[in-house]
Curated annotation (Swiss-Prot):
Organism: Azoarcus sp. (strain BH72)
Protein name stated in the entry: ATP synthase epsilon chain
Keyword Membrane carried by entry: yes
CDD domains reported for this sequence: F1-ATPase_delta
Coiled coil: none
PANTHER family given in the database record: ATP SYNTHASE DELTA/EPSILON CHAIN, ATP SYNTHASE EPSILON CHAIN, CHLOROPLASTIC
GO MF term (any one): proton-transporting ATP synthase activity, rotational mechanism
Length: 141
């Protein structure tokens, strides 16, 4: 029997995933993080991107797009507190491409530093979402 860790992925709106996993991978602030059972305690910010969960006794990984947030790792428990979280199967490529286009337009027409920072964040989120969609389509997790 494989070792597991309990994983909770939650957003402000709802709980997206809760269950036992053999492995979790996600975009940390300093790069891609891989969490296995028994990982040392850790708390860090996460960047927009795909959280991949290798669920116990399941061939396919669960994929959840997060728009940033916090990761907390404790013995036996991994918690992802996401600003926004969308199940991989619910991602909409057309909406993501439209969000990217609008963010690029806002960057070109910014009227203040605040507008520029907001547009940069929206662009980074849209690009990460598109990358997650493309990886899902190709079967690359």
């Amino acid at each position: 029997m494989a070792m597991t860790v309990h994983v909770d992925i939650v957003s402000a709106e709802e709980q997206i995933f809760s269950g036992l996993a053999e492995f979790v991978a996600l975009p940390g602030e300093a790069g891609e993080l891989g969490i296995l059972p028994g990982h040392m305690p850790l708390m860090t910010r996460i960047k927009p991107g795909a959280v991949r969960v290798k669920v116990q006794n399941q061939a396919e990984e669960e994929v959840v797009f997060v728009a940033g947030g916090l990761l907390e790792v404790q013995p036996g428990l991994v918690t992802v507190l996401a600003d926004t979280a969308i199940r991989g199967k619910d991602l909409d490529e057309a909406k993501a491409l439209e969000a990217k286009r609008k963010a690029e337009e806002a960057l070109a027409n910014q009227s203040s530093q605040l507008d520029y920072a907001k547009a940069q964040a929206e662009l980074a989120e849209a690009i990460a979402q598109i990358a997650a969609i493309q990886r899902l389509k190709k079967g690359i997790h």
